[in-house]
Amino acid sequence: MMKLKSNQTRTYDGDGYKKRAACLCFRSESEEEVLLVSSSRHPDRWIVPGGGMEPEEEPSVAAVREVCEEAGVKGTLGRLVGIFENQERKHRTYVYVLIVTEVLEDWEDSVNIGRKREWFKIEDAIKVLQCHKPVQASYFETLRQGYPANNGTPVVPTTYSSSVSGIR
């Protein structure tokens, strides 16, 4: 299923969830520092770069495209961390590891909407994400648990109380 919204086509899976893809962009293979970007809706908040998949687009291709647009980085795509559900917002996001090999000086979202990017130590990234993006904070817990990147990757359902979900 597809829906048009302004300049983009949104794709949905059979359950009506928006299909999304994102990357945990690490500075090196040691995976000690991760790149977060400022939210387009709340520029004072940090988020994991990612977004909606285009029609017929593979999740891995969408993830690489989204991080280039939102964070201005390119790199080596690694393992699939997992597929995460945000039941409150009806999103299903494929999350990958990306080892950054190139940092662009100017990129699409920096030019168009003034988006910023910043490197965070993992613990600090979890802290800044927990209050307003708890599903994104859970990406790191799943990464630590080391689920294999294969067809058996579990869908990780996440639900949070309405008091938390009202904070975007």
UniProtKB/Swiss-Prot annotation:
The keyword Hydrolase applies. Its cofactor is Mg(2+); Mn(2+); Zn(2+). Keywords: Acetylation, Cytoplasm, Hydrolase, Magnesium, Metal-binding, Nucleus. The active site is at E69 (proton acceptor). Its main location: cytoplasm. Substrate binds at R10, K18, K19, R20, S39, S40, R41, R89, K90, H91, R115, K133. GO terms for molecular function: 5'-(N(7)-methyl 5'-triphosphoguanosine)-[mRNA] diphosphatase activity; 5'-(N(7)-methylguanosine 5'-triphospho)-[mRNA] hydrolase activity; diphosphoinositol-polyphosphate diphosphatase activity; endopolyphosphatase activity; inositol diphosphate tetrakisphosphate diphosphatase activity; inositol-3,5-bisdiphosphate-2,3,4,6-tetrakisphosphate 5-diphosphatase activity; inositol-5-diphosphate-1,2,3,4,6-pentakisphosphate diphosphatase activity; magnesium ion binding. Mg(2+) 1 binds at G50, E70. SUPFAM superfamilies: Nudix. It comes from the Eukaryota. Changing E70Q: Loss of diphosphoinositol polyphosphate phosphohydrolase activity, but retains ability to regulate the ERK1/2 pathway. Belongs to the Nudix hydrolase family. DIPP subfamily. Monomer. This is Diphosphoinositol polyphosphate phosphohydrolase 1. It comes from Mus musculus (Mouse). The lineage of its organism: Eukaryota, Metazoa, Chordata, Craniata, Vertebrata.
